[in-house]
């Protein structure tokens, strides 16, 4: 499912990150009294009355004359976020009034001609809010709306109006049940475009070009050996009609949108530089959203000797510890080395992502684990796992019914996942483990 984007913009220290935490019901956004704490944009899945959208938190926008060395980059990224958005939330500080910085942001927002809500934050006294709103009409971006991000005042009515303006989902996730959606993701210049072109070369039948949900991205539907693949195109980063271009930002946004729509993510890594922090972030996004993951070490032919090859694999081991189960393939998109193997790896990863394990198979594993005797306790209580069942797929999700959920540590979760992966074939796909409390008759005594 492709989620529409809602961008939050404003000058520094008006409460944008607090509002993000309120709307997305998370504490991931860093909140601090100092200016400029949020320098990079961050992404959060939010839900209001069953309608999901992607909330983008941007850094504080400062005037072009600012002495802050990050100001230009932050401004560029905030504008890029606003350009990608279906709805803009422009946040100002009601306790301070209109500032020159607010007016600068307002000029930027007005030029975009997007649906915009002007949110006057930090109005924690509803009885006095009308007295504080009138001066914000001068910004020329519509009627000011009083909110308190800290206490939640006004946010419910706001979200009702926001979701009413969001475009309907394209529905491509469910309209093509026999088509496998594949996203080619990764940082700029890793070789995504070359790989994309090589994969859909002359020996394939290109059925159609379909406009994707991201502006000016094209999805290509390919038929190969009787199977259909929808290649979610993030390979080409097209130029925007604005001088505020930020290639890394657009790459990240398009990768994010592609991941939301994909069954399998192909993470293209430039082997000449190894796995970077941005590769790590993109891999994490794919895992969080439940994509099967295939890591393609591109430009392998440029590595000169075993020493360089070992150094690259060291970055893989160090940076991609969150996905030891991922499939890896050494390729050259330029020469075509091993590119033909990608299709079989995509098929296998997608099949495992859709795996169904019977309850009897799962509980046989649980019996083996009990007999092995590995469990956890807090000295007074001992964890007992009564039974387990599969409760979802794409990716596979399993619910364990236990006596005390608070005894389940992260280490024990990893132990269970490792045992499950050793027993069942989940190569290439994440799995989800959930734990619910269920006391046996003996526990109740």
Feature locations, PLM:
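Conserved G1/Walker A P-loop phosphate-binding module
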Residues: 1-69, 167-252, 256-259
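Conserved nucleotide-binding/hydrolysis micro-motifs of P-loop NTPases
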Residues: 35-37, 60-62, 95-97, 122-127, ...
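Switch II of P-loop NTPase G domains
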Residues: 37-40, 53, 59-86, 91-108, ...
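Canonical P-loop GTPase G-domain recognition
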Residues: 115-117, 124-174, 292, 301-357
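Long, well-ordered amphipathic alpha-helical subdomains in the mid-to-C-terminal portions
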Residues: 183, 343-350, 355-416
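Acidic, glycine-rich loop-and-beta core segments that form the ion-binding/anion-interacting portion
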Residues: 215, 220-296, 301-304, 311
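A short amphipathic beta-strand at an alpha->beta junction
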Residues: 425-440
């Amino acid at each position: 499912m492709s989620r529409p984007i809602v961008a939050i913009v404003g000058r520094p220290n008006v409460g944008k990150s607090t509002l993000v935490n309120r709307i997305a019901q998370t504490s991931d956004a860093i909140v601090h009294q100092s200016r400029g704490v949020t320098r990079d944009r961050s992404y959060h899945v939010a839900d209001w009355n069953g309608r999901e959208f992607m909330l983008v938190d941007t850094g504080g926008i400062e005037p072009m004359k600012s002495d802050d060395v990050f100001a230009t980059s932050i401004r560029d990224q905030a504008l890029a976020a606003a350009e990608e958005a279906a709805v803009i939330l422009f946040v100002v500080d009601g306790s301070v009034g209109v500032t020159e910085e607010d007016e600068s942001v307002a000029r930027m927002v007005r030029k975009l001609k997007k649906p915009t809500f002007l949110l006057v934050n930090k109005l924690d006294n509803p009885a006095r809010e009308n007295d504080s709103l009138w001066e914000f009409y001068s910004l020329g971006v519509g009627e000011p709306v009083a909110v308190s991000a800290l206490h939640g005042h006004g946010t419910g009515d706001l979200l009702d109006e926001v979701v009413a303006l969001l475009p309907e989902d394209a529905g491509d996730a469910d309209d093509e049940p026999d088509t496998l959606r594949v996203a080619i993701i990764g940082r700029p210049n890793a070789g995504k475009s070359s790989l994309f072109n090589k994969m859909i070369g002359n020996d394939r039948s290109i059925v159609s070009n379909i406009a994707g949900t991201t502006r000016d991205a094209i999805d290509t539907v390919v038929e190969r050996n009787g199977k259909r693949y929808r290649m979610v195109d993030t390979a080409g980063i097209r130029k925007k009609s604005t001088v505020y271009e930020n290639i890394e930002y657009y790459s990240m946004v398009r990768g994010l949108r592609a991941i939301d729509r994909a069954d399998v993510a192909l993470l293209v890594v430039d082997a000449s530089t190894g796995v970077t922090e941005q590769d790590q972030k993109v891999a994490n996004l794919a895992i969080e959203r439940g994509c099967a993951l295939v890591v393609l070490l591109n430009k392998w032919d440029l590595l000169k000797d075993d020493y360089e090859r070992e150094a690259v694999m060291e970055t893989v081991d160090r940076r991609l510890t969150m996905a030891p189960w991922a499939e890896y393939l050494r390729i050259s998109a330029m020469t075509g080395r091993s590119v033909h193997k990608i299709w079989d790896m995509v098929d296998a990863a997608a099949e495992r992502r859709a795996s169904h394990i019977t309850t009897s198979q799962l509980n046989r594993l649980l019996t083996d684990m009990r007999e092995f005797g590995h469990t956890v306790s807090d000295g007074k209580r001992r964890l007992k796992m009564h039974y387990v069942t599969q409760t979802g797929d794409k990716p596979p999700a399993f619910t364990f019914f236990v006596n005390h959920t608070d005894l389940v540590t992260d280490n024990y979760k990893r132990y269970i996942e490792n045992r499950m992966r050793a027993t069942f074939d989940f190569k290439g796909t994440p799995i989800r483990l959930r734990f619910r409390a269920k006391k046996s008759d003996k526990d109740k005594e």
